[in-house]
């Protein structure tokens, strides 16, 4: 009888093409997502070598990082560097016969939102993209992670990837979440617990009753930020919630093929007694709405807390690092999180740009007005999310409240397009990174859930949404 295996073990074993004595493996790749930033050199490498894309039907190209989100983008991209990258992807996709969603396509959006929407992402698959937040797709019980540009070329040419297996880590979150506490709070709490290096060298499996109770969109939020916890990939075993989500997607199997797929997908779980090299446990009932205070995703506290004092940290290097973060953020120890005023709000990104995220934000914004002096923007994660939100009237709620309703794209998650912070501006953001300069030169980012961001836009400062009305 074979030894018990983890979910990661099973997917890995099913995709190993060859293994060397030192543990280096050649892994078959089921799906390859491509965007305009990390792909130009890869396609050029193919062109120079006279190679084709080995499996164009397993490759999907989407523009997201550089595209403007303003309504006038139909008139063209003004920024020359951005325009060149977008035009290059369009040409490369055409030259190599790869399906491509341009900024004029209703299916266009952030690549990690588009893949699941189209059923391109399915359980049990290996999925890669030249983007560290590819871990998002692990929510479906797939092994998904980011790769570098040279690896993008390798996958395009061979549909394989050279890898060494990571260790297994289990993050178990048990219990029931309190009202107002979301998947974003779970993932920020996990990173606060393990630190940004806690998952280094591991693939994380998220489990427990609190994870099981999440929708697919919530699970995607959790897996999305695995890389912020140091892990290249994070995954959740597929279940009935997963099957119900994927079955009506355009690229999902249908009829008898779907039944066969589901019978296989049901085997994708960690066996009883499977070995994990590291186990972390959290009590969902003890998680409150989370706000980041520093310049690392591990710098988090509950909204009811105060800005911590770095002098309480024993490690000298880390203590100095946290003081630098406070200086950059313009904060002082002991400040109540609810006293921190904001200038900007960004609701969107591959972490929180889905329809459920917009519904959460709209519930906070309904019948209210954005505070004077606050610039708040809503960026749907895809054209399909935007259409659904407008069909539900969410756009009207946001516009009447004073939010800016935008077109889909990565937007202010990163300062690679027109949406960015000015020096010194403080932003409540539903994105995944609060690094120095991430949202703009000297911009100050606080990571929060969509509901927390919307409430901050209305109040002009952070509030505990469990008590705020």
UniProtKB/Swiss-Prot annotation:
UniProt keyword Aminoacyl-tRNA synthetase present: no
Coiled-coil portions: none
Cofactor(s) the protein needs: [4Fe-4S] cluster
GO MF term set: 3-isopropylmalate dehydratase activity; 4 iron, 4 sulfur cluster binding; metal ion binding
The keyword Oxidoreductase is annotated on this UniProt entry: no
Annotated GO biological process: L-leucine biosynthetic process
Catalytically driven reaction(s): (2R,3S)-3-isopropylmalate = (2S)-2-isopropylmalate
Cofactor binding notes: Binds 1 [4Fe-4S] cluster per subunit.
Cited InterPro entries: 3-IsopropMal_deHydase_lsu, Acnase/IPM_dHydase_lsu_aba_1/3, Acoase/IPM_deHydtase_lsu_aba, Aconitase_4Fe-4S_BS, Aconitase_4Fe-4S_dom, IPM_dehydratase_rel_enz, IPMI_cat
Protein origin, superkingdom: Bacteria
Annotated [4Fe-4S] cluster binding sites: 350, 410, 413
Pfam family, one: Aconitase
CDD domains: IPMI (cd01583)
Enzyme Commission code(s) on record: 4.2.1.33
Pathway the protein takes part in: Amino-acid biosynthesis; L-leucine biosynthesis; L-leucine from 3-methyl-2-oxobutanoate: step 2/4
Keywords, ordered alphabetically: 4Fe-4S, Amino-acid biosynthesis, Branched-chain amino acid biosynthesis, Iron, Iron-sulfur, Leucine biosynthesis, Lyase, Metal-binding
Subunit structure comment from the entry: Heterodimer of LeuC and LeuD.
Family membership: Belongs to the aconitase/IPM isomerase family. LeuC type 1 subfamily.
Function, as annotated: Catalyzes the isomerization between 2-isopropylmalate and 3-isopropylmalate, via the formation of 2-isopropylmaleate.
Protein name according to UniProt: 3-isopropylmalate dehydratase large subunit
Species this protein is from: Brucella anthropi (strain ATCC 49188 / DSM 6882 / CCUG 24695 / JCM 21032 / LMG 3331 / NBRC 15819 / NCTC 12168 / Alc 37) (Ochrobactrum anthropi)
